[in-house]
Curated annotation (Swiss-Prot):
Membrane disposition: Multi-pass membrane protein
UniProt family annotation: Belongs to the tellurite-resistance/dicarboxylate transporter (TDT) family.
Domain of life (superkingdom): Eukaryota
Protein known as: Sulfite efflux pump SSU1
Induction section of the entry: Expression is strongly increased during growth on protein rich medium containing keratin or cystine-arginine.
UniProtKB keywords: Cell membrane, Glycoprotein, Membrane, Transmembrane, Transmembrane helix, Transport
Function recorded in the entry: Sulphite efflux pump required for the secretion of sulphite as a reducing agent. In the presence of sulphite, cystine in keratin is directly cleaved to cysteine and S-sulphocysteine, and thereby, reduced proteins become accessible to hydrolysis by a variety of secreted endo- and exoproteases. Excretion of sulphite mediated by an efflux pump also represents a detoxification pathway for dermatophytes during infection of the epidermal stratum corneum, hair and nails, which are rich in cysteine.
Record-level GO cellular component terms: plasma membrane
UniProt GO molecular function: sulfite transmembrane transporter activity
Gene: SSU1
Transmembrane segments: 26-46, 60-80, 102-122, 136-156, 168-188, 201-221, 235-255, 278-298, 310-330, 344-364
Pfam families noted in UniProt: SLAC1 (PF03595)
InterPro entries: SLAC1/Mae1/Ssu1/TehA (IPR004695), Sulfite_efflux_TDT (IPR051629), Voltage-dep_anion_channel_sf (IPR038665)
Knockout mutant characteristics: Leads to hypersensitivity to L-cysteine and sulfite. Abolishes the ability to grow on human hair and strongly impairs growth on human nails.
Length: 375
């Protein structure tokens, strides 16, 4: 039997192994982990704005919001630690054809926190919380635009890629400004200063115009890839849901910006007297078209999932956010059209997203504890 010192040596070796595993986890951390923020944040937003509320639902949304903030700052701290200890890993990440695409998850996860501040904190804390959210939004918008402009150019000049290896993850850096534009509409609606709201929504329309058409181009290329080379590998099959992200969030953003434009434009005598109504109606019209386009991509994704087994990885968080933002467009149409159909459908989608969040979050915690996700 081992002596006392032998037991001590075994315990010391085990402690060193655990510390080594922790450093390996930090070393292997990548931006895709911020998709946890995206999924958690959109679930909180859906529950907070569910068309059919019940007692206690608001507090569940608040708990998810707080959890999301904690996770965000935890991941941000890990990321800063990683790149401070291993500066070369940042350059390697930018040069990586897959990991660089995941940069877009950072501002999109941050945007869900900003939206929750508006939905949850502003009604309680008042105008200063709205101004605080507005300040955070400008940071998010700047980061989103930088990623949208920089990463696709890296794809053109530095990355080695082919049509066969393409996945829908190419959309992630491009969708970031779409999410920021939609978030800007939410923030602008809470601002009491009409001039600030006007500036915000005009910037949002420009961001929307920069990103949504480019996302449509990527969708065309992605469809060609699927038609020629068939479905993506099973490890990446969950990414089949990503195309509904820019369509759902783009539609929601246009409707939300139209709501603010309808209110703010006449007050500031901006453009013609009916300009706000035109922006509102056109936003709803285009949003319906984008929502319909999203339906067929949702069908493609669901049909793809039935083609075989696939195993858990961090990419499973794609089950939550794309469908979540598609749901926000659905519930917004129910609100603007006064439609029970869209209210019920939005509620159904919200329940599905919440159930998927519970499943994926539980698996993520379990696989993180076993270190399987960091190998």
């Amino acid at each position: 039997m081992p002596s006392g010192s032998g037991f001590h040596n075994i315990e010391e070796a085990g402690e060193k192994a655990r510390k080594r595993d922790d450093w390996i986890a930090i070393s292997n951390f990548h931006p895709g982990w911020f998709s946890v923020n995206m999924g958690t944040g959109i679930t909180a937003i859906l529950l907070q704005n569910l068309p059919y509320q019940f007692p206690g639902l608001h507090y569940i949304a608040v708990i998810l919001f707080i959890l999301n903030v904690i996770i965000f700052f935890l991941f941000l701290t890990i990321s800063i630690t990683r790149y401070c200890l291993w500066p070369d890993k940042f350059k390697a990440m930018l040069a990586h054809p897959a990991h660089s695409m995941l940069l877009g998850t950072f501002p999109m996860g941050f945007a869900t926190i900003i939206n929750c501040i508006v939905f949850i904190c502003v009604p309680v804390w008042g105008e200063w919380a709205s101004r605080f959210a507005w300040g955070l939004w400008w940071i998010d918008a700047a980061v989103s635009v930088a990623i949208c402009y920089f990463v696709p150019f890296m794809l053109m000049t530095k990355h080695t890629s082919s049509l066969e290896t393409m996945t829908a993850a190419w959309l992630l850096p491009i969708v970031a400004p779409v999410v920021a534009a939609a978030s800007g509409g939410v923030v602008a609606d809470s601002l009491q200063n009409d001039t600030h709201a006007l500036i915000t929504i005009l910037v949002c329309y420009v961001m929307w115009g920069s990103a949504v058409p480019l996302a449509m181009v990527i969708l065309v290329i992605y469809f060609q890839r699927l038609a020629i080379h068939k479905l993506v590998p099973r490890a990446a099959i969950v990414s089949a849901l990503l195309p509904i992200g820019p369509l759902g969030q783009g539609g929601f953003g246009l409707m939300q910006l139209g709501v603010v434009a309808k209110r703010v434009f006449p007050r500031l005598d901006f453009l013609a007297p009916i300009a706000g109504d035109i922006f509102y109606v056109m936003g709803a019209f285009i949003a319906m078209i984008m929502w319909g386009f999203g339906l067929i991509w949702l069908w493609f994704a669901l049909a793809s999932f039935t083609r075989g087994k696939f195993y858990f990885n961090i990419g499973w968080w794609a089950f939550t956010f794309p469908l979540g933002v598609f749901t926000t467009a659905t519930t917004q149409m129910g609100k603007e059209f006064n439609s029970p159909f869209f209210d019920i459908l939005g509620t159904f989608f919200s329940i599905v997203v919440t159930c998927m969040w519970v499943l994926v979050f539980a698996l993520t915690v379990y696989k993180s504890c076993t270190k399987e996700l960091f190998r």
